[in-house]
């Protein structure tokens, strides 16, 4: 088929470059809509035979209007209706082309663009962005319905595939030199507003990484300069997680466990020599760790641990009361004990501080005893190259949940929230395959 569309553009002589661009874009979209209608018309001309009896004698009986939303705007297609002279039945040749729409009005390319825009921005912003960038005329409600339907299907596919991978027998252990040296797993939750329950609901996120690369160190001059004020400290080595996968769900924690275990098998071609799991010590994370990563080295991230212990010392210092110097000494002492894994001494120190104080000061002691298996020597872990902070998983929660789902006034149903994070994890995982300079989310 050959389709020819002629263009005539009238542009004022005083038009600016931006005005010229907008006018050319508008006329180009009109030409694309006209070419689309002509292509459908030629497709109708090529189908001469009746789909019921195969006869080629037919009579035109008018047209039936059909509106299709495309990437370049809404197109009104006059479908021609014919009457077969052999069997007497009517048919529309264009119906075969519209079968893939399944009774809808949105084309497949526009659906894919709506999925991408809807899982990246609020629905109204996504509708406006598509209209501005490509001329697509699709409402925010249509984007929401398309995203929820496809996202729920994708979430079910991810879960079924993860359960299939986890139920399959593990690959035989290969030679140690072919195995990944380290597999990092991080898990955490992110809270969003809920339409179903007060207080919100928790979305569960995990990130799995099999390769860590050092970032280039910034240049540092040892000479004095008036343009650089403040303390001159040597830069710290920063790292980037190269081979990673995100998984997330708003369903039960068991779903995330299967997704994380399947992601661990996908990022590591060979069984890893060692697995390190970093989390905040939530009970559901411990349950999934015991089920899917029983041999992992479990690390309670340092930020959560020290925040709670520091708060307990501050409460005790205010109630005693302790002077600022004595309080800072307790901070330094307990921080040193916990950093080097001397948990028993830290518990004894907290007990001596909390003597005669209310239960608020004793919560840190209970938490330390409860999290004892996950607390070790952070100095030793740091020397081994293990992450001890929560930056890896906190960043994952921010990318997967917070940036899209924690806007002002947003409240979610659990199935729809799961649909959004299923598509967002697909977007992030496919984006990380690209080189760093080509990524949309570096």
Please provide the spans of the model-predicted regions.
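Short metal-coordination and nucleic-acid-contact micro-motifs, chiefly zinc-binding Cys/His arrays
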Residues: 39-49, 64, 77-80
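Short, cysteine/histidine-rich loop/knuckle motifs that typically chelate Zn2+
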Residues: 51-55, 86
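Cys/His-rich microdomains that often coordinate metals
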Residues: 54-58, 91
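Short, isolated positions in well-ordered beta-strands
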Residues: 57, 75-77
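Catalytic center-proximal scaffold of phosphoryl-transfer enzymes
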Residues: 1-38, 79-442
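Short Cys/His-rich "knuckle" micro-motifs
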Residues: 60-64, 94-97
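Short, intrinsically disordered, charge-biased short linear motifs at domain edges
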Residues: 32-42, 68-75
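Intrinsically disordered, low-complexity linear regions
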Residues: 1-7, 47-50, 60
